[in-house]
Amino acid sequence: MVDLSVLDLAYIGEGFTPADALANTLDLAQHVEAAGFTRFWLAEHHNLAGIASAATAVCIGHVAGGTKSIRVGAGGIMLPNHSPMVIAEQFGTLETFFPGRIDLGLGRAPGTDQQTLRALRRG
């Protein structure tokens, strides 16, 4: 059997809130888990009004906590935007809470506009 996965952006549709989008993301993860999918990925995007997954590690914890066995991961974290140590600590902690279920995908593209990029790298 082929392993299948889903990549979700936690899209905030017109008339919906970020809370609605994250509830829909969890619902989708539960459905694809029940259908036998093996992984659920969340994408990191910043400063976009229609996407609720900017705090990717937090969203991954939310999805992993609401599912039983599906692997949950970042597809991907743009490492130039973050301290590698912080990412390692966040995903190590997630792995402690959800052993064998957390995946970390890394990228190197800025993935955002210059103003947001400067704000991300400031810290």
Each model region followed by its residue ranges:
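Structural motif
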Residues: 43, 75, 105-107
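N-terminal beta1-alpha1-beta2 module of alpha/beta enzyme domains
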Residues: 1-72
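Active-site nucleophile and cofactor-binding loops and adjacent substrate-binding regions
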Residues: 74-82
